[in-house]
Amino acid sequence: QERGNAYCFMNVGKYLERILQSIDFLNVKVDSLKTMNNNLNESYFWKNLLVSIGGYQLYIKTYKSIFSVDNIIELISLNEFFPRSIKFSLNKLYTHIMRLEKFNKPHENNLNFMAGKLRNQLKYSNLASIKKQGLKNFAYEIQLQLNDISNEINKVYFYQISS
């Protein structure tokens, strides 16, 4: 049983916001890490970050090691089982955009293409490609594409031409 448009719109908004929050969290925390100079503070810092986004238990189960910046970036960006990760949220966003399209059948719609393109870009990303591109550039590129998706949602579903 499908829940309808309202449920899909609510989830599109939820996952758009969740992706942006995860990106912001990652950017802010990695920037503030540069001011730290002691391993005890750093370890405490990473634990608090993971607890605050609900990822501490998953991190411990997945990596079974001391805190590593690479592992944390991978968890928050690329883990498809962590509900606060960019990849998980993007997959959910894509699912709900597809459902909206099924319910509404809009005439001109690049939304499916745009969301699918971003989803595949992240699907074929790994930690090495993120590091090569730079975390800031990686995050900025995703934010730009999410803004385009958001604008397309407004254009397709909310923009009314008065005649």
Describe each model-derived feature in a short phrase.
Residues 1-163:
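Alpha-helical transmembrane segments and their helix-helix packing motifs
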